[in-house]
Structures are given as structure tokens and as C-alpha cells.
Amino acid sequence: GSEMCIRDSACTMAELKACTQAGATCGGCVPLATQVMKAEMARRGMAVNNHVCEHFPHSRQELYHLVRVGGIKTFDELLHRHGKGLGCDVCKPLAASILASCWNEFVLQPQLASLQDSNDYYLGNIQKDGSYSVVPRMPGGEVTPDGLIAVGQVAKKYGLYTKLTGGARVDLFGARVEQLPLIWEELIAAGFESGHAYGKSLRTVKSCVGSTWCRYGVDDSVGLAVQLENRYKGLRAPHKIKFGVSGCTRECAEAQGKDVGVIATDKGWNLYVCGNGGMKPRHAELIASDLSKDRLLQLIDRFLMFYVRTADRLQRTSTWRENLEGGLDYLKDVVVNDSLGLGAELEAQMQHVVDTYQCEWKTAVTTPEVRQRFRSFINSDQPDEHIVFVQERGQIRPARSEERSEALV
């Protein structure tokens, strides 16, 4: 199919999508389809480039370098100095991600808000019916009884569907856009922060109970998981990042299937990187052994910022690693042995991200001009009447089309 389409001049992902419908539903096959398309183009002797879109004759890595070295703080400045045209729905979110990775400014401030995709624009994951999910951060999967009660009370008050996520936290579904600030105000008052479930950023640090409770535990995996999550929360990257910390080799936190995995040993911590448990599972690889906590944090700082600096748009660490020239040995040299002399620079860049962290939802609900954008209609305060729920297994779910028709009659 791709050969026929390329023969018929389909030389961009948008054209291939229109021709074959590849990537037109969930988008999961887009990276593979892009790879096939470029391989076929190269086989036919056609010019192949890694430009992000028609507005920037640069790869993501080159754009990151231009932003970082040039001290560029806005999309308009980036476009004026290094691009052309007005931008599009590919380069705008990409630029927003790079700007956030470099400078970590509030994503909904005026010059950045218009660049965000629909999830980042409303600081929530939009669902199939137009409602949003709410995911408060629970570092290391740890939550107090009072915290659980507060989440339950908020869910009950606003009639939300509750489910435990794979990342060991509570997901609340069914919030209308105008309810989001009210819900988050109550969660923040109860001590919660944004879980960044909507962002291409650090998601969760999964952990077992470790040596604190488990008779097999070798070290305090929960304590380390909480420390890691609080250090890297808010970091924007080319794609989402997941961690796991296990207190012994029984590996209950599945750290070897995560972007960053840490396993306790009797001499310290083993660090694994570039694992993935998604559509194409990949076993994480051991990059360093028996590390002290300080050395572990140093290597994770370097690894994450090197990934942020060099990966392609929407590329997970596993795919990035597969495409990295020199493979694991090269990655070890750069991160562990500091072969490029970038260590101190990468660590300083990460420290800036850590030092400038803010809970995006706390800033949003306390900034009137940001808060007022959370409504269904620009010229009305009325809620969206097309968001309809029905009861199932004691909770709400989105109404199907025939059920919605009956409810709206």
C-alpha cells in the first residue's frame, strides 16, 4: 500500500494517511508508517529529510539546540528567526514542549497557551464524549487515608467515575470543562498537585512497599520513588516518561519495563533505562550497578536531559534507544562516563527544571485570566448539554449514541 501511495506522490504522513488511513484512528502506527514511508522514498532515490514540518527546515533536535543556545522564549521569536509561515498543529505543540523543557515556564501564560494541544490547553485528558479526566499526583503510589477520603468526597460531589490507573493512582472521569477549576481547587486544598497525566512529561513512579514492610525488601523503594517523583515532576519531554522502583530482585514494581527503572541491591541501586511495556514491549537495559543515591540521581539527571536534547518528536525512550547510533555502549559512555563532557551541563539544566517547578493547576486556579478559559462556550456560561452519562456497575459512563438520543429528547 505504501509503495503505491509513494508512487502516486504521497510523500508526507498527512498524504499517506489520506491515501491508506494509516494512523487515522488511535495513531499508534504513525511511527512505523513514517519509517516505512521514508525507507521506501530512500529506496526510490527520493530526498528524505527529518524536518518537523513545512514551517521549519530543521529536525526536533536542531530546533531544541536553536532554542537552548539562542535563549528563545516564544514561538513567534523561533518562527521569525528560524522558520516561515504561521506554524501548524505539528510545530506549535512541538515548540511548546521544547520551550517547556528548556525554560519550564507556565504553559498557559498568554504567549504559550495558544501553542498547546487540547489536553495541555485544559490541563486534562479529553475523553471520547468531550468530558475530561482528573488525575492528582500520588508520589510513589503513596496516599494517606485523609487523602483518599478527600479524593472520594470530590468524586462523589461532582459525580465522577473513579478508577485506579496502571500507574498506581486514582483517575476521576466525567468532569465538564467548567468543573475542572472547582475540582482542582478542592484537591489542591486537600494537599494534592497536578499529576500531569495530560502532558508529555513524567507520569508516575511505580513502587513496591520495599524494605519498610516487605520481609524480602533490601532497601526503601517507596522512599526513593517519592524522592524521584518529586524531583522530576513537571519535566516536559518528547514523550511521556514512566519510572519504576523495586526494593529487591523480585521486581514487583516492574522497573525493567519502564523508561527509568531502579532496583535495590545489597550494595546500592541498579539503574535500568529505555524499557517500554506498551504496544511494542522492550526490556530495559542495565546501565549502571550498585549506585549510591547521589550517583543514581546524577545519572538519571544526565539520562533524561540527554533524551530531551536528542530524541525526535513524540519518540519514547525505547524507540530513541533503538535508533541511537552506537547503542547501549554509546549511551553508557555519554551518561555514565561523561564521554562528551556534557555531564555538568545536563545536570545544571535539570536542576533549573527542578528549581522552577510549579503545580500548573494551582497557578491556573489562582490566575483569573487563565481560570476564565475553562468553559464550554465562549459567549455563555451554560454547560455542554451533549455530555450525557448513564449508570453502569454503580458509576457513570458516557452514554452511547442511542442512549444520548433518548436522554436529549
Language-model features, listed with the residues they occupy:
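Compact, charge-rich alpha-helical regulatory domains located at protein termini
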Residues: 7-37, 45-53, 57-95
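Mobile "lid/hinge" segments at catalytic clefts and subdomain interfaces of large enzymes
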Residues: 247, 251, 256-318, 330
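N-terminal basic/disordered segments at the start of proteins
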Residues: 112-144
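Small-residue-enriched alpha-helical segments and adjacent helix-cap loops
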Residues: 19, 28, 32, 54, ...
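Short, small-residue-biased leader/transition segments that mark boundaries at the very start
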Residues: 1-6
